[in-house]
Amino acid sequence: MVVDLNFHKVIKYFLLIFFFLVFSSKSFSENFTFKILADLSDPWGSSFISNEELIITEKTGKIKIVNIISKEVYEVEHNLNYFVHGQGGLLDIIYQNNYLWISYSENRGDWKTSTSIAKAKLNKKNLDFENIFQAEPPIESGYHFGSRLAIKDNYLFASAGER
């Protein structure tokens, strides 16, 4: 009988990976719990603003703060000129150094929209956003806005759909 010299090595690695997956997946699943903290309508983006509070965007246009300890939820007013249609609405939100950045589908008039990004100083009652980016040209569509935000080394990164 001829045995490939790599056969034993392949079997050894296969068994090692198999046992790792079998035993580690069980231990991961035992420590994972899922709790519904708030009744939200189409939540899209979220970011911790403290150890206890999470700010959340709802695609339908609301921004809410949820206290994950007390489970208290309250809505924050804002001045965004958003457009809810298809995949459009309020999208991602990110917090850093007492500022918020949000991506959203902006109503540019005459059924034209764009993916836009705005910035505001954190205020838990009323957010006064100022646009820092508007995709050009605005188009007549309710689809493919994207969008996720990330901050790295004081740079704001944003993804968008193929608009």
Model-derived regions: residue spans:
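N-terminal secretory signal peptides that target proteins for export/translocation
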Residues: 1-11
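A generic signature of intrinsically disordered, low-complexity regions enriched in glycine/proline
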Residues: 8-10, 17, 71, 96
